[in-house]
């Protein structure tokens, strides 16, 4: 699937069918958080995807991603983009040992 997004003032509509994979779902959930009019169906029911859904719905200042590495990396970028938010991402003991310095 190739999608190119660029800034526009024109409203557009369309439909993208996804496989429901964890990888596609996680990426599209973050796009939906930025573009709230994006409607998603057939989202993965994986633990990692549920972790991202819960984090994006949370109003807490500390978000626990447990052992979801993709969630940690994607949410790091997302919360860095949201300058009005101060969120601390944490996770399992093993997650906190994994490298992320290059992203921050």
Report the location of each language-model feature.
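Structural preference for solvent-exposed beta-strand-turn elements
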Residues: 1-104
